[in-house]
Every structure is written in C-alpha cells, then in structure tokens.
Amino acid sequence: MFKIFKRLTAKELSMIVLAVIFVCLNVYLNLKIPDYMSDITTLLSTKGTKASDIFAWNTDAPGMRMLLMSFAGFMASVVVGFLAARTAASFTTRLRDDIFHQVLDFSDAEIKQFSIPSLLTRTTNDITQLQMVLTMGLQVITQGPIMAIWAITKIADKNGNWLLALLVAVAVIAILMLFLLIMVMPKQRLIQTLTDKLNSVTRESLTGIRVVRAYNAESYQEDKFEKANTDLTQNNLFIGRSFALLTPVMTAVSSGLTLAIYWIGAHLIEDVKIPTDPTKIAGAMEDKVHLFSDMVVYSSYAMQVVMGFMMMIVVFFLLPRAVVAAGRINEVLDTQSSVSYPENSSEKPKDVGTVEFDDVSFRYSETSEPVLEHVSFKAKKGDTVAFIGSTGSGKSTLVNLIPRFYDATQGTIKVDGVDVRHYDHETLHNIVGYIPQKAVLFSGNITSNMTMGTSNNSPLDDAKIWEALELAQGKDFVENKEGQLKAEVAQAGSNFSGGQKQRLAIARALARKPEILIFDDSFSALDYKTDRKLRQELSEKTQDMTKLIVAQRISTIMDADQILVLDQGKVVGQGTHKELLANNEVYQEVAYSQLSKEELENGK
C-alpha cells in the first residue's frame, strides 16, 4: 500500500501536507465551538443578560465568535476537499498512464499471465479504489483520529464519572471496529478477484455471442454468469449487512453516551446543596450553573470523540479494498517484460532483407513442453518462405519470434544479419511488417488505421494509401464507402466483413514498405479469387521485399521459393513445392487432402 504512494510527486506531497494542516485547523476550530457554547450557557443562566451580550456585530460576543469559528471551519473543510480531490485526481491520472505504458511494453507472455479482463479491472476499478481512499483519507480518515485524540485531551481533566462513561462508549466502538476487522476484511479482499471473474465471463460471452447463439448455449453462458454474479453479490451482501450494523450501533452509542452524561450531570448538580445562609446561596447557584455549562460542553466534546471514531471506521470500509488494489497495481508496475529492447540498435544491418533462424527452440515457460525445436533456415532478400503444418505445429509461434512478441529460449534469430535482440524497438518494427491471423482495426477512420505507427519523417499521403489498398485488393470496396478514406471504422472494425478487415490490415503493412513482410495466416478470410490475385500482385510488385507466409491452404504457398513443413514444433520437411510433393509424406498428406494431382503438379 505504502509502496505505491512512493510514486507521489513533490507537488502532490506538498498538497497532502497542506491538506493535513487545514484538517488540523478545522479540528481546532470545531473544538473551539463548545467553549463558546459554555460561555453562552453561562450568560443565559445569569440574570440581566441581554441578547446583545450573546450575539452582536463584534468579536467580543460569544455568539459572533461561534459563528466566525463555524464559517472558518467550513472554509477549511472546503480547502481540504479541494486539495484532496486535486491530489487524488493528479496521482491516479499519472498512475493510469504508467500502467497503460507498462502494459504496452509487455510481451504476449505477460499479457497471458495477467489476462486482459484482469488488466482492465486493474486499470479502472482498482485505480478508482485508490482515488477514493486518497480523497476520503485526507478528508475523513486523517480527521477522525486527530479529532478523537484532541477532544479526549480537552476533557480528560473533567469529572471522572463523565470520563468513565466516555471510555465505555469508546470500548463499544472498539469492539465494533474489531468485529469489522476480523469478519469483513477477508471478504473485502475477495472483491477484486470476483470482479475479475465476472468481467472475464461477461467479455467471453459478448465476444463470442454469435457462437453462443449458434449452439443454443445461452443457458450455459447464463449459468456461468449467474454463478460469477451470485458469488460477487453474496460477498457484497455480507459486507453491506455487516456495515449496516454501523449506523444503528453508533446511533445507540451516541444517544446512550449523551443520556449518561446528562444523567451523571443531573446527579452532580443535585449534589450541590443550597445552603441556609443567604449570603452563600449565590455561590451555590453559580456552582450549579458551572456544572450545567460543563455538562453541555462535555456532551459536545464526547460527540466529537464519537464522530472521530465513526470517521476511523470508514478506514475499515475503504482500506482493505485499497490495499488489495494497490497490491494488484504494484504487481503490474513491478512486472518487467520478458522481452527487453536496447535504447539504440547496437549493430548496423549487414545483409539487408534476410531472415535467419539458427537452431532456434522455444517454450512458453521453463516447465512447459517445447513448442519449437531446433529450427534452422535462411530467407534471402526478395524470397517467399512459407510455413505449413497441422494445427498446433508451431507455425504462428515461429513467425511471432521475429518481431519479438516472444524471445527464443535457445538459438539465434537474425534480421538483416543482426540478432533481433540487438535492435531497438522502433528500428526492428520499421524493418518488419506484420499482419496477424485475426485482423485488428481500431476505431477512427480508414486513414487513421492506415497511417498507424508512421512518423513525421515518413508520412503517408493519400496517394500512398490508395497504392497500398490497390495492391491489397481493397481499393474497390473503400471507394464504395461513404467518405472513402475518411469512412468510419467502428471499434474492432465491426462495420467491415472479415475479408475487408484482412485486406485493410494487409494494406496497412504494405503502406509502410517494410523490408520483411510476415503474413500469419492472413489470407484465410479471403475468397480464392481474391487470394490468387493478391498473391500474384505481391509477387510482381514486392520483389524487393522478403515475405514469410503462414498458411493452411496449399494453393497459397505453391509458388513459394522455400516451404518449411512443421510437425509438433519440428521441421520435418524443407524445399520447394515440387520437391516436398515428391518426397515428404506430411506435405503430401496435406496437399492431396486439398487439391487434385493435376492441380498440384501445375505448381512451382
């Protein structure tokens, strides 16, 4: 908890110190009010007192002083509220930025470690918990103990019976706080975990809504959601019911304490006997008035003590969630990406346009099975290298190692003759263009998606965008869109078909004119006609680009200069289409399951 507050800036710390000063000032002003109440009570009990003696437009009148103190206390509270809100907003805004930038630097391994729903909860709900505890902490949590302790010191030297009544009330409140600490705090710690689970189920159901409907699985998903929702609801109900005791118990304690103070005060006043000597009657009456005045003041101070403890109970409502939230946020901020980049590339390219794997192996964790084993090949500039194999054979994992979504656990991967680990982030991703299996578009328009990642040094004008769209076979449908390049793109490109999104993603990579293009099964959503035309265009117009293609269709890779056949993470065949068709059983099995013998023999 305290670790995360080390991220506070000097300005924010100074605002916190200033807020605490104003909290102390507010407590002081509030605790002065009972003194003026005592003066007013004494004046009201004195014969010949006029209204002007109690309230007048000068600072000598106790009523005016009481009014000024109340107004000053109100202004101090306003200042504390402003400083608390400003500090909390500033701190959490920066914290969100830090988490967002940290997550952007994560490799796929860290993303999977936390899960997307959990990262979303940490960035939103957890930070909101911290913002709330910081805001309330400066206004309430800080004020509570200061007020309680200060009020007790003000009345500690008064009548012992009154002090005993106050201590009994404090003991009851302490028992309530202990109950909340033991019973509620463990439940508070569960809230974020249960919220993560609910978010995960909701996100899963919404993203897969078509599949859910297609398989009539609504009741199954509803049951999953119902369980997650019920778990969270039951947890929150337990916390809510426990804190529901707070108001009636505190009301009973306050009322009981007030009653006890007045009951004790009545007996103390009654114990002051009126003497028979007329000259001493005035003194005895004055003693009774002083006792009555002390009783009123003590009652006010006692309520301040109770109020202080009530404020401290707020800690037990906010702090457990905030502690858990801070731990979860620190977990993200302290996690270093398994893929780190140097600030600047340490070597200059030696063999432009080449990609080389030298005895590369990869596993997702030290305890998991190898996904790739001893893969070696070299792609020369302008070559087309294809990867084919059964599902789970490691094709996508292999090409994902090139842009360093993961790092190889063994062996070396070179791009342009340089180990990929020696490139800085920007340089490597300027060399390599990547089109993923699932085309990803961002909300905005077509132009904003196409120019994504380009710098001012190499801007993309409309002519270059149209050129890339034409090459990717996307020009026709973009021209038919209202606004054309300015046509709206909804979140995740939901207003485009799968094939259209695929072509836009391909065009986005082509527009940057990288040295190396990676197609991670990027033709799967295209019809055969578009697929064939696109491959033909790529072959003719990107001869200087090295192309690495992961594919399921034999027809997509028949013209490749080199084909690697993968099976359970191992290269079991390497060569051209004709070579593999002649001597590789795995390739033959895949090929003959898709095309006829005549179609295959017409390949390269």
Language-model regions, residue ranges each:
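An intracellular "coupling" helix at the cytosolic face of ABC transporter transmembrane type-1 domains
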Residues: 10, 108-109, 125-134, 138, ...
